[in-house]
């Protein structure tokens, strides 16, 4: 239960100064006589400030954003906290730095419930709250949905098997805006807070027409086309509010989470370096009481939350670390220091993290070889002045230490946490290594400078792209090349193992995972992957040892407990599997998944009443849980409740249309009930869903034979026998063929099939 919001922060004298922004002035209170009624927060992913017309880019086609900039506040020097989506949005929503909220990367990090979000503050004040996101990295499972009455994420990971990485799982901005407009139109009487996240500027750059054709066929042109398309979606939102009369009473905030390097300093996208192309962001605010103004002062992403709340007449909760920017709206000065960081090089590759501070002109980057830039004279950050201005370097280094000391929270040193089993299972198909970091990468020791490692980083990125494009041998070669240059990258061995596994080279994959463990014998990801590879090879005892070792290192790791329980079921030890499941349930780990696994183990133990109870509890936790209804169907069949079994299998197919086992079991029940034509339909569905399902093909052959389709019966009987059906079912194929040949008058062939059936070993 989240603790009650604490409205204890007093907005300082700067808020009183906000009175001069609007006319007429008011004499009483900190806030304008009529504050905005609603808040529309639009976060534009991966948008560099210098790619908008309002920020001086001549090639931009961003009329709606430029018009918004002219009508309100345009902050010319805004800096993000991290050039990654989830950490930046966690700061946007809480007004705190990553060192406080603990979210420092995408995947494996979670915004814990203890942190108070903008949505929670506004919901407590009576606002309708709706969040609409365009990327899986902002899915609710990462904690970012706190406080939203309606949160549109709903990413089906099974549809993204060809995605290059986790951050490639996205949806078009038009779909996000459609959902937001539907929600906005459903209720007009209650004040609203809508957060609309548009991911389109993020790579891959695949803008829809007519935008794509308006720009050169280059990487830069494709990026600009995405921004133009995003601008049009922003326009749709503003037009809808204008049409129903609510725009005039709405505070509109547009901000980016981070920028894009576009090849500068050797980085193609973002996340690795913290140079200006990745950290300088657009920030616009327009609405009642805000006079148009270009603000040159340094501001930060963490300042958005307290500023928006101040404009709405609401005090910011403790411990917001950002500042209200209302003094700047009046034309006063604020001497703010921006702080940025990237732990991505360290968490993923074992190289040094990067941290920086800047005051609007001078920027200091703490790295193994420190960097100092005069942004006024050297906007491209190409002239490192660290050796030329030691006094300024020392002053900014001290400022960095002070900021980090003041903003650090208990979560800062935790590092990534395990991803839930369901997500991990699906992300593994993307070659994504997440939620597990080498112990060595968390230790404080001298590390490689990312400036020297950008070539290796790009090589590993290209390896991932090659894998997605089906060039798996090329991806393996690239990882091996990277390891030849730097054999200490534990995550590279993990990637190599994943690629080798994808190439169906399990022994080499096992060797790669073992090498990762040689580098770090407590690397949970390597332990887990090695155990899983053993399990896939049928080396169940070796797999059990690996999972037990991983469990001892992290007893709450849901994916380890899940695989261990599943392994014990495979070994025919349902009682031991149930003990693991009950341990997970006692720890409140992924309850719906483990209730399902408990039900499965109880079915194996023929405890059907207990299994029914467990499976129903799993569905209460997650109504759309795959295989839960299938297992209930098994229970009801055993209990002789055929109507309920039929309903359960039908329900499984509605939830998961690819559930071939549910179709098969449903067909068998219908066949036994004399509903041959319906049974035939579901037998066909089962073998269409699983083309090598030999047992299902033999049942289909028998159903077709009973219906008089001799040609179909012969074809499917032969196919079923070729696809290695269950031994107990294999004789059926020969008997179907014998029956077909008898009906055709081919007695010798019929006798041959009967003899073949009798020669089969008993099933």
Language model features by range: what are they?
Residues 2-514, 518-539, 545, 556-559, ...:
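Catalytic domains that recognize anionic headgroups
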Residues 457, 491, 525, 559, ...:
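Start-of-helix register in tetratricopeptide repeats
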Residues 482, 515-516, 549-550, 583-584, ...:
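Canonical positions in the second alpha-helix
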Residues 485, 519, 553, 587, ...:
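Structural marker of alpha-solenoid helical repeat scaffolds
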Residues 728-763:
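Terminal, low-structured helical/coil segments at or just beyond the last alpha-helical repeat
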């Amino acid at each position: 239960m989240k603790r009650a919001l604490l409205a204890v922060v007093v907005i300082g004298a700067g808020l009183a100064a906000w009175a001069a922004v609007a006319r007429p002035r008011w004499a009483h209170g900190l806030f304008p006589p009529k504050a905005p009624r609603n808040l529309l927060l639009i976060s534009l992913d991966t948008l560099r400030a210098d790619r908008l017309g309002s920020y001086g880019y001549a090639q931009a086609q961003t009329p709606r954003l430029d018009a918004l900039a002219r009508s309100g506040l345009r902050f010319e020097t805004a800096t993000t906290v991290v050039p990654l989506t989830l950490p930046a949005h966690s700061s946007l929503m809480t007004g705190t730095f990553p060192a406080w909220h603990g979210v420092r990367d995408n995947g494996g990090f979670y915004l814990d419930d203890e942190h108070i979000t903008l949505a929670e503050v506004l919901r407590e004040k009576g606002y309708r709250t709706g969040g609409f996101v365009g990327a899986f990295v902002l899915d609710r499972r990462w904690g970012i949905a706190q406080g939203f009455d309606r949160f549109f994420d709903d990413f089906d990971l099974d549809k993204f098997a060809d995605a290059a990485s986790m951050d490639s799982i996205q949806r078009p901005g038009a779909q996000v805006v459609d959902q937001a407009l539907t929600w906005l139109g459903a209720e007009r009487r209650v004040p609203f807070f809508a957060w609309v996240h548009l991911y389109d500027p993020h790579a891959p750059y695949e803008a829809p027409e007519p935008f794509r054709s308006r720009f050169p066929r280059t990487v830069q042109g494709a990026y600009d086309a995405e921004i133009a398309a995003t601008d049009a979606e922003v326009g749709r939102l503003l037009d809808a509010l204008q049409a129903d009369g609510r725009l005039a009473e709405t505070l509109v905030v547009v901000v980016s989470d981070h920028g894009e390097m576009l090849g500068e300093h050797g980085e193609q996208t973002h996340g690795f370096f913290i140079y200006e192309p990745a950290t300088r962001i657009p920030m616009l605010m327009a609405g009642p009481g805000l006079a148009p103004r270009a603000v040159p002062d340094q501001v930060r992403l963490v300042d958005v939350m307290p500023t928006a709340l101040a404009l709405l007449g609401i005090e910011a909760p403790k411990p917001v670390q950002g500042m209200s920017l209302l003094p700047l709206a009046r034309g006063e000065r604020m001497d703010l220091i921006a702080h940025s960081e990237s732990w991505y090089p360290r968490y993923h590759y074992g190289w040094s993290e990067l941290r920086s501070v800047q005051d609007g002109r001078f920027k200091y980057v703490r790295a193994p070889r420190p960097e100092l830039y005069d942004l006024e004279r050297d906007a491209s950050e190409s002239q490192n002045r660290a050796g030329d201005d030691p006094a300024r370097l020392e002053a900014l280094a001290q400022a960095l230490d002070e900021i980090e000391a003041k903003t650090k929270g208990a979560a800062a040193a935790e590092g990534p946490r395990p991803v839930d089993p369901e997500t991990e299972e699906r992300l593994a198909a993307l070659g994504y290594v997440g939620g597990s970091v080498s112990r060595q990468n968390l230790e404080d020791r001298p590390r490689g400078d990312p400036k020297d490692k950008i070539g290796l980083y790009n090589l590993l990125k290209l390896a991932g792209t090659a894998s997605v494009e089906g060039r798996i041998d090329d991806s393996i070669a690239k990882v091996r090349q990277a390891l030849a240059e730097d054999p200490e990258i534990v995550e590279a061995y993990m990637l190599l193992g994943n690629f080798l596994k994808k190439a169906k080279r399990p022994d080499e994959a096992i060797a790669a995972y073992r090498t990762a463990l040689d580098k770090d014998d407590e690397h949970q990801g390597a332990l887990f992957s090695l155990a899983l590879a053993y399990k896939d090879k049928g080396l169940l005892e070796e797999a059990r040892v690996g999972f037990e070792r991983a469990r001892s290192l992290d007893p709450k790791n849901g994916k380890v407990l899940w695989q261990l329980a599943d392994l014990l079921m495979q070994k025919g030890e349902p009682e031991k599997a149930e003990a693991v499941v009950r341990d997970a349930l006692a720890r409140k780990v992924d309850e719906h998944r483990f209730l399902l696994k408990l039900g499965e183990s109880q079915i194996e133990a023929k405890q059907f009443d207990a299994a029914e109870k467990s499976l129903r509890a799993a569905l209460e936790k997650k109504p759309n849980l795959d295989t839960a209804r299938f297992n209930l169907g098994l229970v009801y069949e055993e209990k002789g409740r055929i109507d309920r079994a039929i309903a359960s299998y039908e329900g499984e197919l509605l939830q998961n249309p690819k559930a071939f086992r549910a179709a098969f079991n449903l067909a068998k029940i219908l066949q036994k009930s004399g509903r041959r034509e319906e049974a035939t339909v579901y037998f066909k569905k089962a073998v269409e869903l699983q083309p090598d399902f030999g047992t299902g093909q033999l049942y289909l052959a028998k159903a077709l034979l009973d219906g008089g389709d001799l040609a179909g019966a012969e074809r499917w009987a032969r196919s079923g026998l070729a696809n290695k059906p269950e031994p107990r079912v294999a004789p059926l194929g020969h008997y179907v063929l014998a029956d077909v040949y008898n009906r055709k008058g081919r007695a010798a062939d019929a006798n041959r099939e009967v003899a073949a059936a009798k020669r089969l070993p008993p099933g």
